[in-house]
Every structure is written in structure tokens, then in C-alpha cells.
């Protein structure tokens, strides 16, 4: 797999679980001898939802809820077959969305 690059994009609602998952990926990739760039923090996506508290009237009484999606990017340069096998066997915490591009 010479001159290849693996780009891993992580998403999660909780930044601590995201950071532990990124640390596990970086640690397993460096242990197998690949060069790692990252984790690079990407902009946090913020969704704001406004809901009327009452069921029928009282439109002035509203409540706002916020959902933040934290993102990280990891590039693995020149991965070996050991690196790919280690990434496939890696156990990541639940709640982390992983997208891998070769």
C-alpha cells in the first residue's frame, strides 16, 4: 500500500468519547509503523431547536434545545497491512461515527 493515504473522519456528540476514540486510532497506527497526521479538530456543528412549552397557546413561552456535533480528522500516511488489520480489529466506544476513505 505504498503512497496511499487513509482519511478517518470521526463524529460524536460528546467530545471526551471522541478524543478517546481518536487517541486509540492514533496509538494503534503509530504502533504498527505508519505516519499519523492529527487528530485535527474540525468546526463543531451546532443545531438549535426552539419549541413552544405549552401545547395549544402561550406562544411567548418557549424553550430552546441545542445539539452539538464534534468532529475530528485523522490522516494515516503510508499505511502498512499491519496498520489496516489493527484498525479493523480496533474496539471504539459507542456513540462515535467513523467514516474511512482510502
Curated annotation (Swiss-Prot):
Give the residue range of the signal peptide.
none
Among the GO molecular function terms of this UniProt record, one is: tRNA binding
Q: Which family does it belong to?
A: Belongs to the universal ribosomal protein uS10 family.
Q: Which UniProt keywords apply?
A: Ribonucleoprotein, Ribosomal protein
Q: Which SUPFAM superfamilies match?
A: Ribosomal protein S10
Q: Please tell me the species this chain comes from.
A: Streptococcus pneumoniae (strain Taiwan19F-14)
**One term under GO cellular component:** ribonucleoprotein complex
> Quaternary arrangement and interactors, per the entry?
Part of the 30S ribosomal subunit.
One GO BP annotation here?
Answer: translation
NCBIfam families from the UniProt entry: PRK00596.1 (NF001861), rpsJ_bact (TIGR01049)
State what this protein does.
Answer: Involved in the binding of tRNA to the ribosomes.
Task: Give the taxonomic lineage as stored in the record.
Answer: Bacteria, Bacillati, Bacillota, Bacilli, Lactobacillales
* Lineage: superkingdom: Bacteria
Question: PROSITE patterns in the record, alphabetically?
Answer: RIBOSOMAL_S10
Q: What is this protein called?
A: Small ribosomal subunit protein uS10
